[in-house]
C-alpha cells in the first residue's frame, strides 16, 4: 500500500465512522431530530454503539442513547440511559448485562450536592468567625 492510498484510508477515518482497514465500521454515532405528535417542539435523540470486528455477533457491545423531550413545563427534561453487554465467552451465547437509568439517580445526586454545599458554606462561616475573633483578640492584646 503506497502513501497516497494510506492517506485516503486515514482521511476517511473520522469520529463518526472508523474503518481501520476493515469494511465494517467499528464506531458509529447517529443524530436525529423528531417532532413529537403531542407538540410541535423537536425532540433531540442521539445514539452511539460500538461493534468489535473480532466478534461474530452483530449486536453491539455498548449502547448509549440520549433524548430530550419537552414536558408540560417550559424547561425540557433530559433523559439519559446507558447499557453495557459484555460477552463472557465468545463461543457461548451467555452475556452479562448491566443497565442503569441516570434520571432515577438525579434526585439523590442533587440532594447530596446541595448538602455538601451547605456543609462547605457553614465550615467557611465558622473559619471566618474564628479568624476574625483571633485578629480582634491579637489587636486588643497588642493595644494593652
Curated annotation (Swiss-Prot):
Biased composition (Polar residues): 68-84
Region listing for Required for DVL/RTFL small polypeptide activity, in residue ranges: 108-139
Compositionally biased tracts (Low complexity): 30-58
InterPro entries per record: DVL (IPR012552), DVL_RTFL_polypeptides (IPR052692)
Region (Disordered) residue spans: 30-89
Family label: Belongs to the DVL/RTFL small polypeptides family.
Protein name from the UniProt record: Small polypeptide DEVIL 18
Protein's gene: DVL18
Amino acid at each position: 500500500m503506497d502513501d497516497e492510498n494510506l492517506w485516503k484510508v486515514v482521511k476517511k477515518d473520522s469520529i463518526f465512522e472508523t474503518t481501520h482497514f476493515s469494511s465494517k465500521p467499528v464506531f458509529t454515532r447517529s443524530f436525529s431530530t423528531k417532532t413529537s405528535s403531542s407538540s410541535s417542539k423537536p425532540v433531540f435523540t442521539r445514539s452511539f454503539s460500538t461493534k468489535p470486528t473480532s466478534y461474530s455477533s452483530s449486536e453491539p457491545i455498548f449502547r448509549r442513547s440520549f433524548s430530550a423531550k419537552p414536558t408540560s413545563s417550559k424547561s425540557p427534561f433530559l433523559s439519559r440511559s446507558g447499557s453495557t453487554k459484555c460477552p463472557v465467552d465468545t463461543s457461548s451465547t451467555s452475556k452479562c448485562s448491566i443497565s442503569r437509568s441516570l434520571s432515577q439517580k438525579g434526585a439523590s445526586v442533587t440532594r447530596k450536592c446541595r448538602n455538601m454545599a451547605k456543609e462547605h458554606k457553614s465550615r467557611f462561616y465558622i473559619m471566618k468567625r474564628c479568624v476574625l475573633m483571633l485578629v480582634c483578640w491579637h489587636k486588643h492584646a497588642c493595644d494593652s
